[in-house]
Amino acid sequence: MIQQKSPSLLGGAMIIAGTAIGAGMLANPTSTAGVWFIGSILALIYTWFCMTTSGLMILEANLHYPTGSSFDTIVKDLLGKSWNTINGLSVAFVLYILTYAYITSGGGITQNLLNQAFSSAESAVDIGRTSGSLIFCLILAAFVWLSTKAVDRFTTVLIVGMVVAFFLSTTGLLSSVKTAVLFNTVAESEQTYLPYLLTALPVCLVSFGFHGNVPSLVKYYDRDGRRVMKSIFIGTGLALVIYILWQLAVQGNLPRTEFAPVIEKGGDVSALLEALHKYIEVEYLSVALNFFAYMAISTSFLGVTLGLFDYIADLFKFDDSLLGRTKTTLVTFLPPLLLSLQFPYGFVIAIGYAGLAATIWAAIVPALLAKASRQKFPQASYKVYGGNFMIGFVILFGILNIVAQIGANLGWFASFTG
């Protein structure tokens, strides 16, 4: 009998990194503008460690169940129906709010690109934000409506383009980083940047979301917990490095005070690119940066809405016929599209709310799963490092994120406006 070769660590790591890295990273420089570069690195490393650990806690619980068992199955068995309902609602909320966030920013960039493409020295074309959002949403929603295969093929093309555009834009930006901008002195009106650290956490959290992929990796590696663990560390580590490079590229070129118009527009990505454009001397870098942002938002939009589409189809029992897929498409896309037309500047705010809901299923629930699984299966072959202390540490991280998001909305904490 020919022994089947075990999948490489790189394959699993790419699944994790590919899931985590997306349009969420575009919000990080704006959400961390208050705490600035050093503080943003601390926030990202802290978030990376806690989110990686919580992912490993899902792995620990998952290994006690048959291959292919879903996240929902494990939560229902270990924590009961109530927690499973809360978990399911938080997942749906995150998917809807991210869809809204991507339509708002994707619409803004579509608007800018079309205006540039169809304007000339003699006449200027002014396509509105509403039209940009409608065009962006309708074209990409058509791929989701068609089939998963259509999404798969189009996403592959977008990812290749995104990687090329990312390296073209960031290498150029990194070469022009100014240390005076990156390590700027504290403004006279502020004694320290630390008060802004807490409110940056919920947006950073969204940048490390991969937890729904853990059951798939358990199946992929044939229940080899150590290999799954290593692939998670490599994948999230790669995401962390890319995020730090992105912070360096943006916050090393765009002065802290210049984030004011970006923050005023809710962290809108097109506003960030417009502000950054003033400090880019080479024209091709602006073009590459625009394409990178557009493709990052498009790939994230397709990935998130495909998951939401399947969730809606299962929830309402819509079949896979033409009529069934049309119903699912309307329920999936219409609410966030209408919201984006009503509130067109809410990208970072929406990402923050997504972080608030994601805290439940990506931090608190995994920690509770680890605790419950150790009580139910005391002889486990794989346990996450840190014992009960680490369970408490991850739950505290989740609570801090919830307090940060709610506190920021209620004005409890300092808010940076540029």
UniProtKB/Swiss-Prot annotation:
Q: Where are the transmembrane segments?
A: 7-27, 32-52, 89-109, 131-151, 154-174, 194-214, 232-252, 289-309, 321-343, 345-365, 384-404
What is a single molecular function from GO for this protein? aromatic amino acid transmembrane transporter activity
Q: Where in the cell is it found?
A: Cell inner membrane
Which biological processes are named by the entry's GO terms? amino acid transmembrane transport
Chemical reaction(s) catalysed: L-tryptophan(in) + H(+)(in) = L-tryptophan(out) + H(+)(out)
Predominant subcellular localization, coarse grouping: membrane
Q: How does it sit in the membrane?
A: Multi-pass membrane protein
The record's annotation in Gene3D superfamilies points to:
Amino acid/polyamine transporter I (1.20.1740.10)
Q: Record's Gene Ontology CC terms?
A: plasma membrane
- Record-linked PROSITE patterns: AROMATIC_AA_PERMEASE_1
Highest taxon listed in the record's lineage: Bacteria
Q: What range does the record give for the signal peptide?
A: none
Q: Which UniProt keywords apply?
A: Amino-acid transport, Cell inner membrane, Cell membrane, Membrane, Symport, Transmembrane, Transmembrane helix, Transport
The question of whether ATP-binding is a record keyword is answered with no
Name the protein family. Belongs to the amino acid/polyamine transporter 2 family. Mtr/TnaB/TyrP permease subfamily.
What function does this protein fulfil?
Answer: Involved in the transport of tryptophan into the cell.
Q: Which protein are we looking at?
A: Tryptophan-specific transport protein
Tell me the organism.
Haemophilus influenzae (strain ATCC 51907 / DSM 11121 / KW20 / Rd)
Gene this chain is encoded by = mtr
